[in-house]
Amino acid sequence: MYLLSDNIPCSFDGSFHYSWDYAQQVHIPHYSQEVGPVYFKTPRKCNVFGMCCEGSGKQVFYLVDESDSIGKGADSVVSMVHHYLYWYGHGEIDGKFHFDNAAGQNKNNIVLWYGLWRVLLGYHRSIEYSTMIAGHTKFEPDWHFGIWKNRWRRVNAETLHDIADTVDQSSKKGHNIAQLVNDGSKPVTFYQWRTFLSQYFKPLKNITKYHHFFISAEAPGIVNVKILSDSPVVSVSLLKMSPPREIIKYRYNDFVIELMNKVDCCILIPVVLRCFIFCAIYIIILVTLPEKVNCSMKEDMFNQLS
């Protein structure tokens, strides 16, 4: 699955910190000198989702046209996070993520299940989620949004591609990167993550009261939660059943391929050839038996073989 990415999962023995958030939606057409939404009573809406890698100082802006949007729910968020880690991730072993405290978008079971799923498949060795405390002001994605909005207020935009141009031109060093949903080279697909992941994981009760979630490959299907950073750890198993065969196959891909190759070789060897090999082994055993062994024993062994 990840062979198309520049950075294969778990190829970098280290950790990276990511943050994500939604910005206020923008409308097109947009003109820098307009007094307000006077003429266009129903302008076209564009949702803006930012995924920031703080180690690189870059943020990808997902521009979602209203015709492509499925809302701002968990399925939309997880789909864009999944796309980002596929195309822009650094292949780190340990991933750390910060996001807003909003339950409908971020702090919910779908986002938590997605982290469990990634660890089970071996895309991360560990994942740590941390949510902002209610009433917080700004964090890393807002800095990138502010730089872009400074550019946005001074330009005209009539199409979605015009919005993408304002994102790319807002930072001289390329810190802001535009990503269209219908990009021909890196298209964004929105999946029904809730339907898929609910087959394998159970909901975490009272999820909204926790602010820290830790998932490790050493304990598959188990999440360690804390209310605050210095609160005691509570371990909860969310796995409904044993991991599906597809998960085991992906995670232990090399072992499975090696094992299947051995099985295929045994199947492809003709039955006559295999019988000949077994007979040769028995004959070697008979010939190399010590002289003190009774000849009748050799005859009995040969008769059993024949």
Regions found by a protein language model. Name each.
Residues M1-S306:
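Extended mixed-charge, aromatic/glycine-enriched low-complexity segments
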